[in-house]
Amino acid sequence: MASLKLKKRDNGAEPDKKKLVIAGIRHQLLLLLRRRHRLFPLVSAVSGCLLLILFSFSTLSPPPLIHHNNQVAVEPNPTTPFRVPENGGRSDRQLWSSRLSNLYYACSNATDTFQVTDTRSQTNRYLLIATSGGLNQQRTGIIDAVVAAYILNATLVVPKLDQKSYWKDTSNFEDIFDVDWFISHLSKDVKIIKELPKEEQSRISTSLQSMRVPRKCTPSCYLQRVLPILTKKHVVQLSKFDYRLSNALDTELQKLRCRVNYHAVRYTESINRMGQLLVDRMRKKAKHFVALHLRFEPDMLAFSGCYYGGGQKERLELGAMRRRWKTLHAANPEKVRRHGRCPLTPEEIGLMLRGLGFGKEVHLYVASGEVYGGEDTLAPLRALFPNLHTKETLTSKKELAPFANFSSRMAALDFIVCDKSDAFVTNNNGNMARILAGRRRYLGHKVTIRPNAKKLYEIFKNRHNMTWGEFSSKVRRYQTGFMGEPDEMKPGEGEFHENPASCICRTSEARVKEKAKHVNEDDSSEYSEIGNVPISSRSDLDHSQFDEVIF
């Protein structure tokens, strides 16, 4: 009974409290009216009213919600300024592999209609080739030289590498590539020799016929322009040989291109060994890693005609370098960037990768030469991906010494690491990017990220006007079709070296599983340049062994 009375008394306390509050407010208002002519009492009255109002709200308002975890839930603010998340990402399986790759396999075998060397050999025709450009540009020349020799029914002399261009690398073919493998592996396709016979050398010592064929020269172009001279002189040299063969050839010639590129052209044992050492050291750091081919060297930026905010110093330095190319016209940097033809900056590449879902914890291998701006240019990328590595950070000076003074050999090491990475990304569409894109398609459609620079330009430019969620959503949408998935490119689209459609066949999943039994997937095995088939299982040089592999 006593408790019941107490409860009633408590219930009646609330109305009494309200009456007291109202009476207090009324009293203060009366004081205000009586003393309105005095400033100090006015301030006191207003202050008193405010205090009483605040007190009344605090006593009458309901109590705050209590959460089970004793923390107040905070809803994300959609107007939050652009801020890259400190941690996290969706480093899931989709980022590291193609879900459709099992439906395709490499198929570069010659068919029964392909004429082998023994049935079409001409012993009095010798083709000399002088390649041009950097290592991967020269690689395209080597590949097409074999096909040109086949078209002309000529004996190919091992191509000479470019030792006079910007890079000034004195390496010969045999210093970078396994020349004996190159000759023997293609013996059924084209006859290749290391040097001209002595009698031919003496004949051309004073009168070597050298010529340059047009770019994208077709088979009929070679037969019309080169064959008559070759028949007459017996020896012809084709100079500046890069992209001098048509992109559109018949299927047999395209398959020959693939046999050269993906099977016959492989690096020397010393380069392969060092390249594999770099890969192994990356694998010790993480199960998966991304390789970035960063073309941000001064010559690349000068050639592009783009501007990166370095003021008058940048304009003078790159402008002077650009004048070395006599055929280049004055560039409109903003127009070039708007059209997606500017190499992405290290920061932009980092933002794109984070937007795609690669977390801050991902290990990143950077394949690059001298970066314009040095460490200051790389700092934003390093902030986005602190686990950043190069061949210099992964090795000692002693280990790298045999390669350090040769730009082509250093580029070959980067090529191997990029080729064997789980995901490959590039900031431009240069020769190495194209060669690797095609190779990774041929060897199993491994994740290969090519920036959709024309679309990305707008979101990079306006990123501070959007949230991170909006930014990453747009990055993923714009990069659809630029991730190395099968069927992203139609047959014949782009350079053949980046889209070897004639050498990639579709198969059923059942056939894939059946043939996959014969593939050794142990990463610790010794692999050749052909892909995932251990060297020990390929002692024979017959082409038929290679197309039975599903990559």
From Swiss-Prot:
The protein's GO terms of the molecular function aspect are: glycosyltransferase activity
- A biological process (GO) annotation for this entry? fucose metabolic process
The record's CDD domains line, in alphabetical order, gives: O-FucT_plant (cd11299)
User: What keywords would UniProt list here?
Assistant: Carbohydrate metabolism, Fucose metabolism, Glycoprotein, Glycosyltransferase, Membrane, Signal-anchor, Transferase, Transmembrane, Transmembrane helix
Q: Which GO terms describe its cellular component?
A: membrane
Q: In which tissues is it expressed?
A: Specifically expressed in the root hair.
Identify the metabolic or biological route this protein is part of: Glycan metabolism
EC numbers on record: 2.4.1.-
Q: Where does substrate bind?
A: H293, L294, R295
Q: Look up and give the membrane topology term.
A: Single-pass type II membrane protein
Pfam short name (any one): O-FucT
Q: Which residues does the annotated region (Disordered) include?
A: 515-539
Asked if the Swiss-Prot or TrEMBL record annotates the protein with the keyword Methyltransferase, the reply is no
- What InterPro entries does the record point to? FucosylTrfase_pln, GDP-Fuc_O-FucTrfase
Q: Where in the cell is it found?
A: Membrane
- According to the record, glycans are attached at N109, N153, N405, N465
Source species, domain of life: Eukaryota
Grouped into one coarse class, the protein's main location is: membrane
What is the enzyme's main class?
A: transferase
Q: Where are the transmembrane segments?
A: 39-59
Q: Which family does it belong to?
A: Belongs to the glycosyltransferase GT106 family.
Could you tell me what this protein is called?
Protein ROOT HAIR SPECIFIC 17
The organism is Arabidopsis thaliana
